Amino acid sequence: MAKSQLTTLTRQLIPMTTSMTNILDIIKADYAKFPEAQTYSIYSEDVYFKDPVYNFRGIKQYQKMIGFITFWFKNLKLDLHDISRTDNLIKASWTMSWDAPLPWKPRISVTGWSDLTVDKFAGALENGEGDRELIISHIDYWECSKFDVIKQHFQFLR
């Protein structure tokens, strides 16, 4: 293999590998500081989001949802248990807990996982070169029902 071919091959492989590594690192960092200072630039403009409560499309709606959570859910904590990637699917398992905005401030906890689908977008890097992976779909699943979450608000009624 000629040196120029090897250089071309290296340039093709390194950005892809770096992109894959970087998006996982960014997601880990975002989960650790959630809901503060999220990296919205890793999401496509028309990202699809779904969980047991919300179902919408668009980064602006996603930002509004995070704003709602930030305002109403106090002492919010998102513990990342595991994150892995297979092809274009990133799976993250987590537990989110918060103090509910009620006078008795019950601590609510939901364990679940997120399926994040990524796609490549040409020339999306900050310097205008290369490809960048963006999250095009973010679907959250809970290991409990919505009713189970509601019951946590009123445990004193047992």
Model-assigned labels for residue ranges:
Residues 1-158:
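C-terminal and inter-domain tail/linker signature
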